[in-house]
Amino acid sequence: MGIMATRFVMNVLLLLSLLFASLSNAGHSAWEAGATTFTSEWIHIDPSFDFPTWPHETIRYYFSTPEMKEEFANDIRAAWQLWYAAGLPETFRFIEYSRARCEAAPDDCLLIIAEYGAPSFFTSLGRQRIDPWDRNVMYLAFQGTEDEHDKAVIIAHEIGHAWGLLHEHQNPLFWQWAFRGTRSDSLVQFYCENVLGFAEVEHEVNNTLLLWAEDGPCRDQARAYEFGFLASEMIPWRPRYQQPHRLWPHDSDVDWDSIMIYESHSFGVDDEHGNKKLTLVRTKDLQVIPEPGTVTELDVVGMVHLYHPRYGKFREVFHNDASSAWYAVFKDKIKNCLIKT
């Protein structure tokens, strides 16, 4: 009897040890610092009502006009091949559908508008309707001087957005702010005064301190958007996001070659010689961030994580969370609840 009791106790202790061992590793480094997972470099949307992802790992796209399809179809396919070449599983599909089928179910398709003109590129993040089309859209305006490789790289960047990837350089953990700019312990140094449109914003604000305030257009993404200021594409991402970094990442934690990063002269004004001024550099030795050359393996890791979290589902956003799409409804229901005393 004593032996059986001893075995029972030992089995209970063993089960408890296994339970606590599994609980200690149950966090996910995408949202919990210190979770025991490998560290990789990427940042993507937090799937939600505002930023839904594509079902069945499939994006169906269509062109706005037959002429656009004839001109740009090969460029789109070449860009998608860069993702496969970097190791993206072929379970991810980016396939063309007919305009008629997509117009019948616009929420299930990505509208591609491509043309030549003043360079401009923007894309829905996941299945996010954007103005002025009220559709999931990829907008591509090429200058006309780009070669085939340059086009493919630009489109591959936009495809990353379409799936839900964010700009690598906009990870909030990479940024540390000083009184008027970025601190020396920030992983990047930002030169707001060199960004196109700064002079107009400075004139409108008319206060240097307010430019760099916590809610100023050189520091706050939402405020920069209000001014139509391109710094919004460079400074930290404000909405919810997921990424794997520890609380204080190092320079080596950043994928400086990511297809989703901006090179150091992006949106820079011209200097007296007609060259673009620096807008964003690495703090380490003030190194210049190069123009992305292709999709990296770590870009692929980020996309795979977005559609296949290592520990199952993403965290649930409860209705009583202020960031929940149902928060307003929740508050209204609470007010109408009958409380018995």
Segment roles from a protein language model:
Residues 23-341:
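Zinc-dependent metalloendopeptidases
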